[in-house]
From Swiss-Prot:
Its main location: nucleus. DNA binds at R47, R70, E158, G231, D233. One of its GO terms (cellular component) is nucleoplasm. It comes from Osmerus mordax (Rainbow smelt). Belongs to the XPG/RAD2 endonuclease family. FEN1 subfamily. Structure-specific nuclease with 5'-flap endonuclease and 5'-3' exonuclease activities involved in DNA replication and repair. During DNA replication, cleaves the 5'-overhanging flap structure that is generated by displacement synthesis when DNA polymerase encounters the 5'-end of a downstream Okazaki fragment. It enters the flap from the 5'-end and then tracks to cleave the flap base, leaving a nick for ligation. Also involved in the long patch base excision repair (LP-BER) pathway, by cleaving within the apurinic/apyrimidinic (AP) site-terminated flap. Residues 1-104 are annotated as: N-domain. Interacts with PCNA. Three molecules of fen1 bind to one PCNA trimer with each molecule binding to one PCNA monomer. PCNA stimulates the nuclease activity without altering cleavage specificity. Its EC number is 3.1.-.-. Keywords: DNA damage, DNA repair, DNA replication, Endonuclease, Exonuclease, Hydrolase, Magnesium, Metal-binding, Mitochondrion, Nuclease, Nucleus, Phosphoprotein. Gene3D superfamilies: 5' to 3' exonuclease, C-terminal subdomain, 5'-nuclease. Phosphorylated. Phosphorylation upon DNA damage induces relocalization to the nuclear plasma. GO terms for biological process: base-excision repair; DNA replication, removal of RNA primer. This is Flap endonuclease 1.
Length: 380
């Protein structure tokens, strides 16, 4: 879900913090990509006659086709992508996940009605609402990325939080996702539409977090409180407080606690057992991948492995797979003259513990590494 209305609010209040870019402008950049968001996009967009692509066994293959070609497109533009997969969702997200389940159940009813009435437009609409990224989708994409020579990371919790940690640690330049909560987790740069279909011709939006805070006059903690007021995945919101009012209240009072002391709670009731403090803590000190022990390597594709997996098992065209491998190899040759930051290597080990930066008091947190030895092929 992300943060309700945040993109528009930033566009209104801090337009100078947003740049419109073309993909070629990120040549030589390492970019952490929210994998689940990408796979969801592919399942929605990569279709034939309104239906997801399938192989002869009836297995969905839209996610694989999307992942293969969109990744190649980035590589051809000199980008070094690293995909970050979600881990276990935080307990605070259970309410949001329950709501999503209710919306799916409603969509199933509406789909059945549309099918009975033969309303193709509604059939397409409600079918897309039922799209869900499964563990099998994730596992197949991880296998594909390994065969393509592209690294991936398994986050211990929310992918966007670990993407932000990679940016903060200087391992990558930006987080690529459609959800704005990457900014709430503190990513220095957030990119939207990087993995969108080329046919849509959407410019890539580049958000700069420090400029956002500067232009709206808030600290990171105040920005987090603003996002909670707008609406996030982890708790409810105060009734009757829209985006502009939320911004005004945070600027005036500085925190949710002070706002609650200064508004009419009979007109603006708060949710029962409102867990805004817990949500704030999750944004400030999330469970993230240990960047100090992470090794990211981009290597040559395993052409025969790709043909076996994508052609023999998934029934893709062998010619297209081999042509794709040629494009990957060519992109590797072209990317040797990259940006200065591409010449620095990252070293790591299998597991470790680290402390989150101290933000309020001294909070110690055990963190799990998202990289294991089998997930990255050795580069030349």
């Amino acid at each position: 879900m992300g943060i309700h209305g945040l993109a528009k609010l930033i566009a209104d209040q801090a337009p100078g913090a947003i740049k419109e870019q073309e993909m070629k402008n990120f040549f030589g950049r390492k970019i952490a990509i929210d994998a689940s968001m990408c796979i969801y996009q592919f399942l929605i967009a990569v279709r034939q006659d309104g239906n997801v692509l399938q192989n002869e066994d009836g297995e969905t293959t839209s996610h694989l086709m999307g992942m293969f070609y969109r990744t190649i497109r980035m590589l051809e533009n000199g980008i070094k992508p690293v995909y970050v997969f979600d881990g276990k969702p935080p307990q605070l997200k259970s309410g949001e996940l329950e709501k999503r389940g209710e919306r799916r159940a409603e969509a199933e009813k509406l789909l059945a009605q549309a099918q009975e009435a033969g309303e193709q437009e509604n059939i397409d609409k409600f079918s897309k609402r039922l799209v869900k990224v499964t563990r099998q989708h994730n596992d197949e994409c991880k296998k594909l990325l390994t065969l393509m020579g592209v690294p991936y990371v398994e986050a211990p919790c929310e992918a966007e939080a670990s993407c932000a940690a990679l940016v903060k640690a200087g391992k990558v330049f930006a987080t690529a996702t459609e959800d704005m909560d990457g900014l709430t987790f503190g990513t220095g740069v957030l990119l939207r539409h990087l993995t969108a279909s080329e046919a849509k011709k959407l410019p890539i939006q580049e958000f700069h977090f420090s400029r956002i805070l500067q232009d709206i006059g808030l600290s990171h903690e105040q920005f987090i409180d603003l996002c909670i007021l707008l609406g996030c995945d982890y708790c409810g919101t105060i009734k009757g407080i829209g985006p502009k009012r939320a911004m005004d209240l945070i600027r005036q009072h500085g925190s949710i606690e002070e706002i609650l002391d200064n508004i009419d709670l009979s007109k603006h009731p708060v949710p029962e057992d409102w867990l805004y403090k817990e949500a704030r803590g999750l944004f400030l000190t999330p469970d993230v991948v240990d960047c100090s022990c992470l090794e990211l390597k981009w290597s040559e594709p395993d052409e025969e492995g790709l043909v076996q997996f994508m052609c023999a098992e998934k029934q893709f065209s062998e010619d297209r797979m081999r042509n794709g491998c040629k494009k990957i190899l060519k992109s590797r040759q072209g990317s040797t003259q990259g940006r200065l930051d591409s010449f620095f290597s990252v070293t790591g080990s299998l597991s470790s513990k680290r402390k989150e930066p101290e933000m309020k008091g001294s909070t110690k947190k055990k963190l799990k590494t998202g990289a294991t030895a089998g997930k990255f092929k050795k580069g030349k």
